[in-house]
UniProtKB/Swiss-Prot annotation:
Key words of the record: Cytoplasm, Ribosome biogenesis
Family that this chain belongs to: Belongs to the RbfA family.
Location within or outside the cell: Cytoplasm
Domain of life: Bacteria
Gene, per the UniProt record: rbfA
Gene Ontology CC terms: cytosol
Pfam families in UniProt: RBFA
SUBUNIT field: Monomer. Binds 30S ribosomal subunits, but not 50S ribosomal subunits or 70S ribosomes.
Protein name: Ribosome-binding factor A
GO biological process: maturation of SSU-rRNA
Amino acid sequence: MAPGRRVERVAALIRRETSELLIHGIRDERVHQGMVSITNVEVSGDLQHCKIFVSIYGEEIQRSEVLEGLEAASGFLRGELGRRLQMRRAPEVHFHLDRGIEKGTSVLNLLEQLEQQRETLGEVQSESDQPTTDETTTVNKT
């Protein structure tokens, strides 16, 4: 099996098992303060390090507390991953906040605001494009 393929398989397994552990395994209350979604998992080529990218729904204070809880549980998570995946050495787990969903939402909001401005300007311009009665009579006389 090619090393790249193995790394991808291990990353997918880590994502699945970590999701399961987030729901049923981690008892730290900080982790359950916000809605946590695993967006991506990157594993190093030697399978010794693992970056887990998470999206956390909630206020900034909640996000930082949830991230602290996840970091505190990383040792437990590493042990469980090693046991569940039957790996000789489980990778070190590092959590990173993924702000991609947040950025996407802000872009969509900006696009919506632009659309509303266009509609407002379009209504104003269409009203100003209407010929006045003097212009209408002038056009009809020629």
